Amino acid sequence: MTDMLTTPRPEAQGQFLVAALYHFVAFPRFAEFRGPLQAVCDANGVKGTLLLAHEGINGTIAGTEAGIATVLAYLTAQPEFTGLEHKESRAAAMPFLRMKVRLKKEIVTMGVETIDPNQVVGTYVEPKDWNALIADPETLVIDTRNDYETAIGLFRGAVDPQTKTFREFPDWVRNHTGLHNKPKIAMYCTGGIRCEKATAFMKEQGFEEVYHLKGGILKYLEQIPAEESLWDGACFVFDERVSVTHGLAEGEHTLCHACRQPLTPEDVLSPHHEEGVSCVHCHAVRTEEDRERYRERQRQIALAKKRGERHLGS
C-alpha cells in the first residue's frame, strides 16, 4: 500500500521555521534518548531528521515557531546539550515529510576513528572576518562538501575536491601533497559540522594554521549582504527547498528525484529531462526498466496531488 501524507496547501501553512543543529559531545546514552526525542518532536508537529551517536547529535528540523522552540528547549535541558547552537531559516511550505530520529555510528560520516572534534579542531572564523581570510594570498580555501553540492555554488577561489562522499575527503588530502604549499588552510561546509571533523583531520595530518567558517555557508549567507559577499551561486540544502541564496532566500533549483542531483531552470529545459525519471546528469545511465519504474512513481505522485495529498516517495 502506498504511504500518503495529507498536507495543507502551502498558502494555508504560512512560513515554517527550519532549525539546523549539531553538537559534538560524549553521549553514551544516545540509544535510549531516541524514543523520548521522537515523541517530543511528534507531539509538537516537528518534522525532519536527527542523527544520534556516541559523539553527539546532528540534523535539521522544521515546524511552527512554538514547535521548534519546544524541541530545542527539550534538547538544551539535557546535560549533554546545554551548549547546543542552531541556525534558523524559513520555508514557505513544510520541507520534510516526516520525523526521523536515527541511531548512527557517526553523526557525520568520515570514517576516521583517530580524530575527536571534542579535543582538537581548527580555529573558528566569524562570517564578518571570513572575506579577509580567504582573500589573503597566503590562504588555501577548501570546500569540504560533495560534488553535487559544489556544482551549484562555491566561495570565490576555493579548491573543490569533487568528492562523491565525505568519506573520500581524507584520501583526497593524503593524495594532494601540494596542500602544504600555503601556510593557512581555510575550510567551509554547509552548516559547520563537516569542518569540525575535516579540520581535526587536517591538524592530525600536520597542518598547523587551520581555520573554518563558524556556522558554515548558511550563517555567512544570513549575515553578509550580497554586495559584500565572496560567495558565488547557491547553497545546496538537504530538504525540499533544494537551495538557498543570500538572506537564506529559497533558490531556484529543483531536485531530480531519480538521481537526487540539483537542477537549474536551464537543466529542466533539456530534452534529457523528464520529471522524476531522468535529467541531464543521469539520463545516460538509466535503463528502460528504471525509467518505467520512475514513471509509475510519478503517476502515483500526480494522483496524490489531485487528492490534495503528498506522496511520501516524492
From Swiss-Prot:
Disulfide bonds: none annotated. It catalyses: uridine(34) in tRNA + AH2 + O2 = 5-hydroxyuridine(34) in tRNA + A + H2O. The active site is at C189 (cysteine persulfide intermediate). Coiled coil: none annotated. The keyword GTP-binding does not apply. GO terms for molecular function: oxidoreductase activity, acting on paired donors, with incorporation or reduction of molecular oxygen. One of its GO terms (biological process) is tRNA modification. Its EC number is 1.14.-.-. It comes from the Bacteria. Pfam families: Rhodanese, UPF0176_N. Signal peptide: none annotated. SMART domains: RHOD. Keywords: Oxidoreductase, tRNA processing. HAMAP family: TrhO. Catalyzes oxygen-dependent 5-hydroxyuridine (ho5U) modification at position 34 in tRNAs. This is tRNA uridine(34) hydroxylase.
